[in-house]
Amino acid sequence: MRKAGLWGLLCVFFVSEVKAAIVLEEERYDLVEGQTLTVKCPFNIMKYANSQKAWQRLPDGKEPLTLVVTQRPFTRPSEVHMGKFTLKHDPSEAMLQVQMTDLQVTDSGLYRCVIYHPPNDPVVLFHPVRLVVTKGSSDVFTPVIIPITRLTERPILITTKYSPSDTTTTRSLPKPTAVVSSPGLGVTIINGTDADSVSTSSVTISVICGLLSKSLVFIILFIVTKRTFG
Amino acid sequence: MLFACALLALLGLATSCSFIVPRSEWRALPSECSSRLGHPVRYVVISHTAGSFCNSPDSCEQQARNVQHYHKNELGWCDVAYNFLIGEDGHVYEGRGWNIKGDHTGPIWNPMSIGITFMGNFMDRVPAKRALRAALNLLECGVSRGFLRSNYEVKGHRDVQSTLSPGDQLYQVIQSWEHYRE
């Protein structure tokens, strides 16, 4: 009977491990070069209205790369431009809106909105975004650019109601960026399909790691109880 | 095997939305709203009216009319603000429905969510179990009819706006729902 109880415990460990390791499903956005990605990331107004938020890229097997962050004071609505990235932060509506303009095929990859509060782990908002940018064929359409504003070499940091004094978070850009407004394109994102893929490799790895550590604890406890009562 | 298939088919059929009390039945004033909601919707916002409760079809129909009257005639809105209202008689009352944008939360959330309100004030008590069941049935039928994404998320009104709604006790209940996400 004790053996059955112990196997039951093992089952519980396995189940709890898989539950804990379930990550957010990716949301896939399929866009064409030149289009704009728009992602709306809600956050909990009670917990995170006053927290810093960020848009990050997740390169394969590397540390997340923070691309743009909201600027202080976080309690006021603000808009931050960093090259092709725009963050619109509305703390009273509990929404962070991310835009990536003039998409290129090289922008394809995995991204995420987070609550950015080091040294704590970032809190992922919405879902990880799987962006897939393909080359548009010439006979489909070309974006209507009305007008193009050529910007200077220096990065732009625009915040409303606040003059930025902290410029250490800006990055210098190697080439001028253009703000492209393409009103004729209408909808700028295609909602991800329901059948989105979970990153199974990361789930598997975390499940296995957790299982190994829990099995180790289980084995030690088993030996100790056997010694005490055996 | 055949029995399992039949059972599964029945389950699919079971989630129709015909239990919703339509506007004509609770004698709603006509809607003057025109902004539509795109489907499927990703978010559901749960609120309470913080007003009177009701626990019978007659009193809940009256209460729904009262709320609509307040929104249309006092606040000047095109219709009752909510997409659906839940009475403690255990019924769902059709407000703006699945297709029309509500005015229940704020300018960012209204076009991207379904607003469901519980008629009453739920700071100090939980709604009747039948009311909670009705809300969950509504959400299930919404998914099966394609109005809600299968991975829709439930938010409390206070999660996305500065408000006490849906009340401490109701808020605690919805936090235990499967689709709740803070």
UniProtKB/Swiss-Prot annotation, chain A:
Taxonomically, the superkingdom here is Eukaryota
Q: Name one GO cellular component term.
A: plasma membrane
Deletion phenotype: Deletion mutants do not show any influence of the antiviral T-cell response. However, TREM1 deficiency impairs secretion of CCL2 and TNF-alpha by neutrophils in response to viruses. TREM-1/3-deficient animals have decreased neutrophils in the airway and these neutrophils have a defect in transepithelial migration.
Ranges for the Ig-like V-type domain? 21-124
Disulfide bond entries: C41-C113
Instruction: Give the sugar-modified residues.
Output: N191
Which residues belong to the signal peptide in this entry?
Answer: 1-20
Membrane-spanning residues:
203-223
Q: What InterPro entries does the annotation carry?
A: Ig-like_dom, Ig-like_dom_sf, Ig-like_fold, Ig_sub, Ig_V-set
Protein keywords: Adaptive immunity, Cell membrane, Disulfide bond, Glycoprotein, Immunity, Immunoglobulin domain, Innate immunity, Membrane, Receptor, Signal, Transmembrane, Transmembrane helix
Q: Which GO terms describe its biological process?
A: adaptive immune response; innate immune response; neutrophil chemotaxis; neutrophil extravasation; neutrophil migration; neutrophil-mediated killing of gram-negative bacterium
Membrane topology term reads: Single-pass type I membrane protein
> Topological domain, Cytoplasmic: which ranges?
224-230
**Extracellular side, ranges:** 21-202
Locations listed in the record: Cell membrane
What's this chain's function? Answer: Cell surface receptor that plays important roles in innate and adaptive immunity by amplifying inflammatory responses. Upon activation by various ligands such as PGLYRP1, HMGB1 or HSP70, multimerizes and forms a complex with transmembrane adapter TYROBP/DAP12. In turn, initiates a SYK-mediated cascade of tyrosine phosphorylation, activating multiple downstream mediators such as BTK, MAPK1, MAPK3 or phospholipase C-gamma.
What subunit structure does UniProt give? Answer: Monomer. Homomultimer; when activated. Interacts with TYROBP/DAP12. Interacts with TLR4.
What protein am I looking at? Triggering receptor expressed on myeloid cells 1
Q: Which species?
A: Mus musculus (Mouse)
Swiss-Prot record, chain B:
Signal peptide: which range, if any?
1-18
Q: Which GO terms describe its molecular function?
A: cytokine activity; Hsp70 protein binding; molecular adaptor activity; N-acetylmuramoyl-L-alanine amidase activity; peptidoglycan binding; peptidoglycan immune receptor activity; zinc ion binding
Name the InterPro entries for this protein. Answer: Amidase/PGRP_sf, Amidase_domain, Peptidoglycan_recognition, PGRP, PGRP_domain_met/bac
Q: Which GO terms describe its biological process?
A: antimicrobial humoral immune response mediated by antimicrobial peptide; apoptotic process; biological process involved in interaction with host; defense response to Gram-positive bacterium; detection of bacterium; innate immune response; killing of cells of another organism; negative regulation of inflammatory response
The organs and tissues expressing this protein are described as:
Strongly expressed in spleen and lung. Also detected in brain and thymus. In the lung, expressed in the intraalveolar space, in the brain, expressed in the Purkinje cells of the cerebellum and in certain layers of neurons in the hippocampus. Also detected in cells filling the space within the intestinal villus.
List localization entries. Answer: Cytoplasm; Secreted
- Residue ranges occupied by any N-acetylmuramoyl-L-alanine amidase domain in the UniProt entry: 39-167
Q: Which domain of life is it from?
A: Eukaryota
Major site of localization recorded for this protein:
cytoplasm
Keywords (A to Z) from UniProt: Antibiotic, Antimicrobial, Apoptosis, Cytokine, Cytoplasm, Disulfide bond, Immunity, Innate immunity, Secreted, Signal
What are the cysteine partners in each disulfide bond? C17-C141, C33-C78, C54-C60
Its GO CC terms are: cytoplasm; extracellular space
The membrane spanning regions, by residue number, are none
Q: Which family does it belong to?
A: Belongs to the N-acetylmuramoyl-L-alanine amidase 2 family.
Subunit arrangement? Homodimer; disulfide-linked. Interacts with HSPA1A; this interaction forms a cytotoxic complex that is released by lymphokine-activated killer cells. Interacts with HSPBP1; this interaction blocks the cytotoxic activity of the PGLYRP1-HSPA1A complex.
Instruction: Briefly state the protein's biological role.
Output: Innate immunity protein that plays several important functions in antimicrobial and antitumor defense systems. Acts as a pattern receptor that binds to murein peptidoglycans (PGN) of Gram-positive bacteria and thus provides bactericidal activity. Forms an equimolar complex with heat shock protein HSPA1A and induces programmed cell death through apoptosis and necroptosis in tumor cell lines by activating the TNFR1 receptor on the target cell membrane. In addition, acts in complex with the Ca(2+)-binding protein S100A4 as a chemoattractant able to induce lymphocyte movement.
Kindly give the PANTHER family that the UniProt entry links to this protein.
PEPTIDOGLYCAN RECOGNITION PROTEIN (PTHR11022), PEPTIDOGLYCAN RECOGNITION PROTEIN 1 (PTHR11022:SF58)
Q: What is the protein named?
A: Peptidoglycan recognition protein 1
Q: The organism's lineage? A: Eukaryota, Metazoa, Chordata, Craniata, Vertebrata
Gene name of the record = Pglyrp1
